[in-house]
């Protein structure tokens, strides 16, 4: 399923454009209609043709598309575009499963969203700490440590931002996160 659906091809291209535009341009239907995305049939990014699967259309290739659109703007020169956002999900966005001895070995499974990739720097500011992956771009809810510890047999020892992980430049990407947890 490493093909984007037509909707994901359009929305992630437009998101990459809007991530690079000044804040005074409204993010609404009027602005959206000004962007004309050209798509090709039968391409991994474009309009898929049956029987190709689009099972991971909302992540993976979408993250790379967003990063490439933002990088294309950055290639215009100083003051444009964004650096690339982190791809892939680390230990802070993991799936846990097992049996909870506190509840008569009741089975559980859940994806935790406790920490995330830091965001890319822009010409105007440093990266956002809770950016996530490019297709999320900071628009996700973070789980509560306390509720997670009450709900599942896990304990968080630490969640902290790490020093000297932001890169060089006038504006820096968000710092990395260190997370330690277990049963």
Where are these regions (language model features)?
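Glycine/proline-enriched, intrinsically flexible loops and inter-domain linkers
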Residues: 1-183
